Amino acid sequence: MAGFLDNFRWPECECIDWSERRNAVASVVAGILFFTGWWIMIDAAVVYPKPEQLNHAFHTCGVFSTLAFFMINAVSNAQVRGDSYESGCLGRTGARVWLFIGFMLMFGSLIASMWILFGAYVTQNTDVYPGLAVFFQNALIFFSTLIYKFGRTEELWT
């Protein structure tokens, strides 16, 4: 059962060459996910304007996710491998530490949004939509970060 789908291939569309458009498609998909995450949170803030319904401190999860998005994508894969980043104040180790801190912020924001969802909304007798908005905002920013970081190729720039 381990090699069940080893020889399975999806039928390829011959009319579009995806290898040339991989960076554009990954960037557009990541941008749509990032925009949708913030749009859901802004919608929840408009629908539930009172702090009793949606605490304004819950926006910090999305802010830290956005900060982590920029931190993670500021470091190229070549810098992490050490191919193109030999000089500088910290070099390859600094790039890896920066990327690690970015992923810690991203996972921390995602976990905090789940905590907000269950701690402030699911266990209480209130509307769950603001908690879902906080969670989906962070989840969509998380997936957009992964797509933007690992969905693009860097060979075109060298």
Swiss-Prot record:
Query: InterPro entries per the record?
Result: UPF0220 (IPR007919)
Task: Name the UniProt key words of this record, in alphabetical order.
Answer: Acetylation, Endoplasmic reticulum, Golgi apparatus, Membrane, Transmembrane, Transmembrane helix
Q: Which GO terms describe its cellular component?
A: endoplasmic reticulum; endoplasmic reticulum membrane; Golgi membrane; plasma membrane
List membrane-spanning regions. 28-48, 56-76, 98-118, 128-148
Primary residence: endoplasmic reticulum
The protein's matches in Pfam families, at most eight in alphabetical order, are given as: UPF0220
Q: How does it sit in the membrane?
A: Multi-pass membrane protein
Which residues get modified to N-acetylalanine?
2
Annotated compartments = Endoplasmic reticulum membrane; Golgi apparatus membrane
One of this protein's GO BP terms?
A: late endosome to vacuole transport via multivesicular body sorting pathway
Q: Which domain of life is it from?
A: Eukaryota
Which family does this protein fall into?
Answer: Belongs to the UPF0220 family.
Assembly and partners are described as: May form homotrimers or homodimers.
Q: What is this protein called?
A: Transmembrane protein 50B
- Originating gene: TMEM50B
